[in-house]
């Protein structure tokens, strides 16, 4: 296969998709090969460029970006392409979003090539980025070629030896020019940080979503709330805005943000947290959002708008007393969710606790960590491509460390019931290597 710019296998390894990018754009497109039969199918062909080819995680579906040149714009204009039912049974269903033809698309903006589009886990939506499209200078504008009429040049005042030199002999050599960095005291980011993040700023795009069933386009992020994180499934997202606190955060290290619940069906948002220091993530089922405040973990339920304190009744503390940063009552970081989204796994520095997202139930899974001074530091997830969250009905491997014995190793819990995971302990006075599954 020649002129291949990108390629990607699906999760099963049966289907190979690739982008053809030939000189002169002749024959450009996206093609698909069945690795079992060798049959090749052309999904798309046009005098255009194609980028960001990607498969959905579980279903036979593709997504990509298509770029065409436009004489009125500095850069190519992109549209979104997607296919469902890529299984060799006829031509798959094709989906396209062209900003030039979409009535609800923001004026003066286009799809960004700097963010990879992706399918949602439930296959109901496609996420992608948009940014401003830069227009070329008006070709009809007449260039001014005349020069302003200038009067006779005035002789500079002062004695000849005091007058500025016209020969250029007194000019400063470029290598000796002083470097001057001007920082305004109201800039929210320090000058050095602006320099370090310049590339990120240039490539920034606003998250948007296309709902597949009705073809509805919804913009999720804007200048008021730039940082948006969608749930893996369902219609909710979390937006974060630190504009009110960014300057002081860069000066004293205490970074706060306002947090919004966003309905991705229509883009409406509601502020649910103000001046929040620690917000975490959305549950795998998209129903709850976890955050930490005033020494306790809380959840916010999207459907009801209800906040619940999860840890007020638990007989332990989740404050990290060993963290000496310039913040009050920092938390010990959570260890994740159960895969059904019904429980969050919290760590108090010794034991790992299962706490219901509804706030009505909890239990200590490892039990003896604090009493035996063993730190069950985390749960091992062998495959990073596994479903988000942990299945408590399956065997769980814990990383463990003896606070005073300095032993380290791993423990296995097989039944998901609370109790010391002693059924299979492997540890000793050594630095335990990474635990891998064959």
Model-predicted segments: where are they?
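Beta-propeller folds
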Residues: 1-438
């Amino acid at each position: 296969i020649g002129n291949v710019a990108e390629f990607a296998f699906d999760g099963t390894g049966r289907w190979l998709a690739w982008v053809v990018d030939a000189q002169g754009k002749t024959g450009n497109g996206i093609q698909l090969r069945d690795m079992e039969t060798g049959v090749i199918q052309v999904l798309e062909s046009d005098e255009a460029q194609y980028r960001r080819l990607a498969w959905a995680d579980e279903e036979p579906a593709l997504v990509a970006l298509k770029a065409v040149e436009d004489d009125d714009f500095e850069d190519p204009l992109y549209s979104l392409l997607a296919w469902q039912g890529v299984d060799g049974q006829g031509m798959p269903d094709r989906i396209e979003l062209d900003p030039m033809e979409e009535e609800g698309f923001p004026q003066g903006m286009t799809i960004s090539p700097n963010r990879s589009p992706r399918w949602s886990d439930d296959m109901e939506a496609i996420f992608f980025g948009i940014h401003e499209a830069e227009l070329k200078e008006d070709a009809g504008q007449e260039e001014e070629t005349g020069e302003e009429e200038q009067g006779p040049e005035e002789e500079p005042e002062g004695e000849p030896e005091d007058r500025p030199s016209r020969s250029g002999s007194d000019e400063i050599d470029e290598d000796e020019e002083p470097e001057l960095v001007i920082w305004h005291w109201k800039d929210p980011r320090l000058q050095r940080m602006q320099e370090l993040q310049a590339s990120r700023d240039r490539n920034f795009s606003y998250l948007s979503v296309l709902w597949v069933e009705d073809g509805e386009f919804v913009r999720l992020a804007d200048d008021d709330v730039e940082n948006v994180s969608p749930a893996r499934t369902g219609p909710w997202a979390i937006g974060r805005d630190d504009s009110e606190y960014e300057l002081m955060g860069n000066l004293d290290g205490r970074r706060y943000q306002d947090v919004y619940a966003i309905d991705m069906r229509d883009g409406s948002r509601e502020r649910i947290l103000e001046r929040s220091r620690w917000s975490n993530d959305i549950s795998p089922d998209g129903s709850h959002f976890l955050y930490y405040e005033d020494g306790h973990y809380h959840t916010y339920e999207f459907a009801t708008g209800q906040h619940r304190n999860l840890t007020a009744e638990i007989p332990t503390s989740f404050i990290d007393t060993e963290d000496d940063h310039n913040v009050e009552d920092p938390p010990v970081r959570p260890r994740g969710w159960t895969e059904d989204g019904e429980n969050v796994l919290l760590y108090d520095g010794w034991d790992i606790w299962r706490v219901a997202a509804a706030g009505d139930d909890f239990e200590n899974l490892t039990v003896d960590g604090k009493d035996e001074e063993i730190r069950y530091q985390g749960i091992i997830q062998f495959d990073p491509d596994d479903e988000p969250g942990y299945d408590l009905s399956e065997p769980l491997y814990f990383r463990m460390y003896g606070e005073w014995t300095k032993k380290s190793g791993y423990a296995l819990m097989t039944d998901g019931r609370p109790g010391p995971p002693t059924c299979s302990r492997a540890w000793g006075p050594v630095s335990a290597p990474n635990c891998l599954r064959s």
